[in-house]
């Protein structure tokens, strides 16, 4: 089953004060708050050396390499524990498609790939913006870190029991990275657009809280959204009421009935459950 790195995202977000997720209480978690914490963004032409103490440089160097080493370490540890990497001794190509009715997970996996890479890029950008003192290297580090994560997932899946290397995943990964880069480079874009997600565990996970660490696989518990923020009109210089900055128009997508935690019989579902597969687009 194609796996997504939401667990990695959460760990990254915890370490970045600049990114606000606005998590509510209860099972339902709103990830990737529509208005990510605004950080000062200078153009490359304005990037310059900032006088720093030796202690400051040491701290930034430590954070930089902890991130560069920590991201792949967390990913690989989780992947080998949960995703069956290494179960296959030969390379497997996958042809998963995108959002067709009979595709793998109905497209929920593709929106998850896009969202996860969007969030990891934005999180890592904020880290490297700090470690590189706003210099251009922040772009190189955040792009390479996020892209390498996506490629590593596909390489691992090529040797997993039932996955395979899927070029479609790499394409939607790139879309997520591209949206994130535009938001970081152009504050006006960020003031209008964001990606977010909502998660509420399905029955299988609600009854087995010890399995919640596998929540990236629980696609039927996820909803993925594109947020259009009316606050952006104020940044265009338009005289609009202040309350508009609290209003968003969300376009979302989710699927139900596709996962191994719903279809039976299996080691996850004892009955011959066969729920209807549903794809839903909503505003």
Please state what every model-predicted region is.
Residues 59-64, 129-141, 183-192, 233-247:
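Short loop/turn motifs that connect adjacent beta-strands in outer-membrane beta-barrel proteins
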Residues 173, 218-224, 245, 277-283:
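Residues that define the transmembrane beta-barrel architecture of outer-membrane proteins
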Residues 199-203, 253-259:
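Transmembrane beta-strands of outer-membrane beta-barrel pores
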Residues 178-182, 224-230, 283:
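Residues on the lipid-exposed face of transmembrane beta-strands in outer-membrane beta-barrel proteins
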Residues 145, 149, 191-195, 245-251:
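Transmembrane beta-strands of outer-membrane beta-barrel proteins
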Residues 152-174:
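Interfacial helix-loop-helix junctions of multi-pass membrane proteins
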């Amino acid at each position: 089953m194609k796996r997504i790195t939401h667990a990695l995202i959460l760990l990254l977000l915890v370490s970045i004060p600049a990114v606000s997720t606005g998590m509510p209480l209860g099972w339902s978690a709103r990830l990737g708050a529509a208005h990510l914490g605004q950080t000062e963004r200078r153009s490359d032409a304005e990037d310059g050396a900032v006088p720093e103490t030796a202690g400051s440089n040491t701290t930034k160097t430590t954070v930089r390499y902890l991130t560069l080493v920590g991201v792949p370490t967390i990913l690989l540890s989780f992947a080998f524990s949960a995703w069956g990497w290494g179960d296959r001794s030969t390379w497997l190509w996958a042809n998963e498609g995108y959002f067709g009715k009979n595709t793998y997970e109905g497209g929920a996996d593709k929106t998850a790939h896009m969202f996860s890479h969007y969030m990891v890029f934005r999180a890592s950008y904020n880290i490297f913006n700090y470690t590189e003192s706003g210099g251009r290297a922040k772009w190189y580090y955040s792009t390479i870190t996020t892209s390498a994560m996506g490629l590593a997932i596909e390489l691992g899946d090529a040797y997993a029991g039932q996955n395979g290397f899927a070029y479609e995943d790499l394409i939607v990964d790139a879309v997520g990275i591209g949206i994130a880069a535009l938001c970081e480079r152009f504050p006006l874009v960020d003031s209008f657009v964001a990606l977010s997600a909502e998660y509420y565990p399905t029955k299988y996970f609600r009854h087995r809280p010890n399995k919640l660490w596998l929540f990236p696989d629980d696609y039927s518990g996820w909803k993925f959204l594109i947020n259009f923020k009316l606050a952006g009109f104020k940044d265009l210089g338009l005289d609009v009421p202040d309350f508009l900055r609290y209003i968003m128009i969300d376009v979302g997508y989710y699927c139900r009935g596709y996962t191994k935690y719903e279809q039976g019989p299996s080691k996850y579902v004892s009955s011959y459950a066969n729920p209807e597969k549903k794809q839903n687009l909503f505003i």
